[in-house]
From Swiss-Prot:
UniProt topology in membrane: Multi-pass membrane protein
Protein name: Serine/threonine transporter SstT
Record-linked NCBIfam families: PRK13628.1
Gene behind the chain: sstT
GO cellular component, one term: plasma membrane
HAMAP family: Ser_Thr_transp_SstT (MF_01582)
Molecular-function GO terms, alphabetical: neutral L-amino acid:sodium symporter activity
Enzymatic reactions: L-serine(in) + Na(+)(in) = L-serine(out) + Na(+)(out); L-threonine(in) + Na(+)(in) = L-threonine(out) + Na(+)(out)
Stretches that traverse the bilayer: 11-31, 45-65, 79-99, 138-158, 179-199, 214-234, 285-305, 327-347, 353-373
Role played: Involved in the import of serine and threonine into the cell, with the concomitant import of sodium (symport system).
Subcellular location: Cell membrane
Keywords: Amino-acid transport, Cell membrane, Membrane, Symport, Transmembrane, Transmembrane helix, Transport
Primary site of residence: membrane
A single GO BP: threonine transport
């Protein structure tokens, strides 16, 4: 048995999830009545995610902000602006795509009983009350807006704390991230249960819905990578951006696609930055920082899946609320780094903007894990390749202003 478990653990998570999906579909189509107990694995998996997600976000944000260092004399300010602007535009693009190609998900009947906010005033009022929520109450009730607010405030307050205090917080953050990793390792079994339950409850049409959702997600990410990002680069360097874009995707994006980790791709990006002849004092800061906060792919995932839930529940969304979602998704995406399935775990934060309960939001997270084999890989490829892309863009824009020749090798 130990040898069997060891062999199973040596198989990549992507392959294990694919196996889980195949088993779930097979059981649901062939012997649904005698294997109904399979669906409990999906419920347990979602329950574990619901339990760990609030604490994860809380400590992760505190640790990141408390350790932020300011005052370095580098080209970092321009890069940070590019990171933030591109992430917001990616989120806005995802919102537009979701309205042009609305996707409906297969949720349980209890998920239909939602009281959505009636207008933008009610949304803002709810948002403000969630911000000032008691931190303990926010953690217990998965009020992610309140959690995010308290985490940011505590992180800022702890920036002047001794290193020992920051190390303790960082260790807590690492420990919770490890727990999340353990939970994610059960994803194949959990997803098997979720797929089984979805097909038994809704039929094979549920898989078609997932296909539509994946098409909107990947289509939006491709648009961001091959249209929006090159446009941002062109406006900064005033020359053909595609040689730089293609090189970043080829030498950074492809690796990130298979590792599915921005953090693991940092050495690749540092080497590529050196090959591009960039300033080491800049890229040694911007690349690790980008792996933390430059999350255009995560912003797309959060926006698309949140609006898929909104369309499913037939909640009316006005222009003001859509813009707030774009900003909120961009901010939330910055907290998705370094965590397996991080962007999916931040979907409840965006869903809370529309009054969608946490249990329904976690069903959407479950759907995200079902399509996560491709979604997470493409998301990471977009995130990580953009780190080098915008670091190089800022460097080349500075050289152009100084009258220096900028030669980009494809």
């Amino acid at each position: 048995m130990k040898q069997l478990i060891a062999k199973w653990n040596r198989v990549s998570l992507v392959k294990r999830i694919i196996i889980g999906i195949i088993i779930g579909i097979t059981l649901a189509v062939t012997v649904p009545e005698s294997t109904k107990w399979i669906s409990i694995f999906g419920s347990l998996f979602v329950g574990a995610l619901k339990a760990v997600a609030p604490v994860l976000v809380f400590f992760l944000v505190i640790s990141a902000i408390s350790r932020h260092q300011s005052g370095q004399k580098t080209n970092i300010q321009h890069i940070l602006i590019l990171y933030g602007f591109s992430t917001f535009l990616a989120s806005l693009t995802a919102v537009v795509a979701s309205f042009l190609f609305p996707v409906h998900l297969s949720l349980t009947e209890s998920a239909k009983e939602v009281s959505p906010p009636s207008n933008i005033t009610e949304v803002i009022q709810s948002l403000l009350f969630n911000i000032v929520d008691n931190p303990v109450h926010a953690l217990l009730n998965a009020n992610y807006i309140g959690i995010l607010t308290w985490a940011v405030l505590l992180g800022i307050a702890l920036r002047t704390a001794p290193e020992t205090t920051k190390n303790v917080i960082a260790h807590f953050s690492d420990a919770i991230s490890q727990i999340v990793t353990w939970v994610i390792n059960f994803a194949p079994i959990g997803i098997m249960g979720l797929v089984f339950d979805a097909i038994v409850t809704n039929g094979l049409s549920a898989l078609i819905d997932y296909g539509k959702l994946l098409a909107v997600l990947l289509g939006t990410m491709c648009f961001v990578a091959f249209v929006m990002n090159p446009l941002i680069v062109f406006l900064n360097i005033r020359q053909n951006p595609y040689p730089l874009v293609w090189r970043c995707i080829r030498e950074s994006g492809v690796t990130a696609f298979f590792t599915r980790s921005s953090a693991a791709n940092i050495p690749v990006n540092l080497r590529l930055s050196e090959m591009l002849g960039l300033n080491k004092n800049t890229y040694s800061i911007s690349i690790p920082l980008g792996a933390t906060i430059n999350m255009a792919g995560a912003a797309v995932t959060i926006s698309v899946l949140t609006l898929a839930a909104v369309h499913t529940l037939e909640i009316e969304v006005d222009l003001g609320t859509a813009l707030i979602l774009s900003v909120l998704s961009a901010i939330a995406a910055a907290g998705a780094s370094g965590v397996a399935g991080g962007s999916l775990l931040l979907i409840p934060l965006a869903c809370s903007l529309f009054g969608i309960p946490n249990d329904i939001a976690m069903q959407v997270v479950g759907v995200g894990f079902i399509i996560g084999v491709l979604q997470d890989s493409c998301e990471t490829a977009l995130n990580s390749s953009s780190d080098v892309l915008f670091t190089a863009t800022a460097e080349y824009a500075k050289r152009r202003k100084e009258g220096k020749q900028v030669a980009i090798k494809a």
